[in-house]
Each structure stands twice: as structure tokens, then as C-alpha cells.
């Protein structure tokens, strides 16, 4: 049978399965593809194909993730599933697989477990906007009171970590029954996809956000002012617009007098484009790599923030020893390294390689940042950790 071509006309959403080990995340992922394949919305993908997830490198960290794609009548989805707990932690912190929403899988037989909590907390920290719950393995629970109890526990846990626990759709079903083609199993998968379609909001496209471009390089063209190059991260820049140069020094205002791409002049540059931008009246020495060009007022420089960080294990090429309070590595934001000091919470003496931790950072120079910004921690040029800004403190 010929493969159905995916329609790119539908809005696209990135999603992923999260939850405790052995609660059925991978079985559910397989079940979604198998049920949707019946209406031509997916290629049926077996459990073993998803479980044998390839390794990928993201910001110097090796992560195993499996990707499947499927579509409902309203949307096109890219779905990520990770084999191991450590892969989830790394994935969510590095943003290797960006999630616009998540499906939290909880076994009805066990109820919420330690990793259920940790994944909900991580989702909150890294800014996953919404999630839907799939209460799996209901075929193993005969007592309806017990099911109600588990549902209440899940709702309380979601509320505790700042999600709207009372509103979140909870779908009860069995991924195994869906894989076996049983009608009640398939019905639950269809209900789940309806909930995902309606409850997980459509993400704001990069081009609709305010203009931002990290500066990678600076050139001066004799008689034609200064050109900065980089890849536009978000928004659109038009010739003649005012922009700010933010980070490392005091914020400066300038005007874009030209946009170039592949040596051709354009009227505008947009998210995803690698461009050169001509700046009016800005001297070569006033701009440097590590700053950003941005829409005026849209982003501010900061030097103190809280972060959620994954610290590489020795086997991953990270440190061999733990670090303590006042550790001073380099923090790599977008295009440059800045030295910073780590302040651990009062109850934490040290952070071991392989851990994930929350702490405060004080940089020696301010960087243009907003909550959700990803960074790497480096020591002598090698990556020893990856993090995400969870709160700005100044």
C-alpha cells in the first residue's frame, strides 16, 4: 500500500508522552499510531520500533528519543517518546524535543509514582503549557471506587505543581486493548486524541513572536556602517525598523537599514533565516557576538536567575566529582560564554554528576534573557551540564 502523504496544511503541534517507568508510555504511543492508521492518519508503528529509540546529540548531551508523526482531522502532530527516565529529564531540560503539550500516562493499577511527580514538576519548570492525562491499564482494575481514587490523586498532584488539576481531561483506557484491536481500547484512544486536539492550545508560531536575532558575527563595510549576522530566532525584521542591541553592555537603539541573505538584498528577514543586518550609525566595536538584536522593549538583560539543570555524568563526558556552592563555570547562552557563580539552595551541600538540580546563578555580565531560555554549562570548553532559566531574579 502506498504511503499517505502528510498534509502540511494542518496546524502543527509537538507533543510527548511523560510519566513513570512501566506505566505504558511507549505502548500508548504505539497504540495511537495503530488506531489512527485505520483512518489514514498515521503509519502504524510497533512497540519494539519505538522502544529501540536512536541516540541523538543535543548541546553535547546524548539523549535517546523516538519520534513518530500522525494526524487527526484537525492537526498534524510530531510525538516524542523516551525509553529511560534520565532521557526524559535531559530531553525536557535541553529542549531537544520541544513540547507544546504532553500526555501524562498513569497506571490505574499503581496510581501516581515518584517519576509521575518528577515529570509533572519538570513540565512546569520548563514551561510545557498544557497536558492531558491517560489513565492506563484500567482493564487491570475491577473496583470503580479505586479508579475514582486514582483520578483524584492525579488531579491533586497536578494542582500541587501549578497545573489546573480540576480542568485537565483524564481519559481512562487500556493501551494494550487498543493494540489488540479491541473496540473499547480503540474508543479510549480516539477520546484521548479528541481531548488533545481540543485541550492543548495551538502554539504561537515563531514568526508571530517579537523579533529576536542572536548575533554570531560582526563586520564593518567601508562607507556602509556595520553588518551583524545570525539566524533569526523569532519574529520578522523589516528594513527601516528600529531595533535594540541587548546584553553584555548597556542597551543601544539603532535602525535596520538593510537585510541580506545569500548576498541578496531583502525587504525583510524572518524566523529561521540566516541573515546579515545592516545597522545605521553603529560602530563595529559597539556590537559583539553574544548580544541580540531585538524589537525595542521586548527583552531585557539580566544577570541573576534561577535554573533547572541536568549535570552530565562522568560516562557522558561530564565532571568526575561533584560541585559545591560558589562553583564558577561558563554559561553558554545562544552564541557566547559568560562566567557565572552557582548558589545552591540552603539544604543542598553539593550536586553530583548525573543529577538534576535547581539553583541560582549570578553572571558577571548581563545576557538578554527570558524565562524558558536554554543554556549549557561548560568548563574548559567541554559541556558539563544543560539548563533552562525558570525564574529571573533582578
Swiss-Prot record:
GTP binds at residues 19-26, 81-85, 136-139. Its main location: cytoplasm. It comes from the Bacteria. Its EC number is 3.6.5.3. InterPro entries: EF-Tu_GTP-bd, EF-Tu_GTPase, EFTu-like_2, EFTU_2, G_TR_CS, P-loop_NTPase, Small_GTP-bd, T_Tr_GTP-bd_dom. Mg(2+) binds at residue 26. Residues 174-176 are annotated as: G5. Residues 19-26 are annotated as: G1. It is found in: Cytoplasm. Residues 10-204 form the tr-type G domain. One of its GO terms (molecular function) is guanosine tetraphosphate binding. Keywords: Cytoplasm, Elongation factor, GTP-binding, Hydrolase, Magnesium, Metal-binding, Nucleotide-binding, Protein biosynthesis. Residues 60-64 are annotated as: G2. It is an enzyme of class 3 (hydrolase). GO terms for cellular component: cytoplasm. It catalyses: GTP + H2O = GDP + phosphate + H(+). Residues 81-84 are annotated as: G3. Gene3D superfamilies: P-loop containing nucleotide triphosphate hydrolases, Translation factors. Pfam families: GTP_EFTU (PF00009), GTP_EFTU_D2 (PF03144), GTP_EFTU_D3 (PF03143). Belongs to the TRAFAC class translation factor GTPase superfamily. Classic translation factor GTPase family. EF-Tu/EF-1A subfamily. PANTHER family: ELONGATION FACTOR TU, MITOCHONDRIAL (PTHR43721:SF22), ELONGATION FACTOR TU-RELATED (PTHR43721). GTP hydrolase that promotes the GTP-dependent binding of aminoacyl-tRNA to the A-site of ribosomes during protein biosynthesis. Monomer. This is Elongation factor Tu. It comes from Rickettsia parkeri. The gene is tuf.
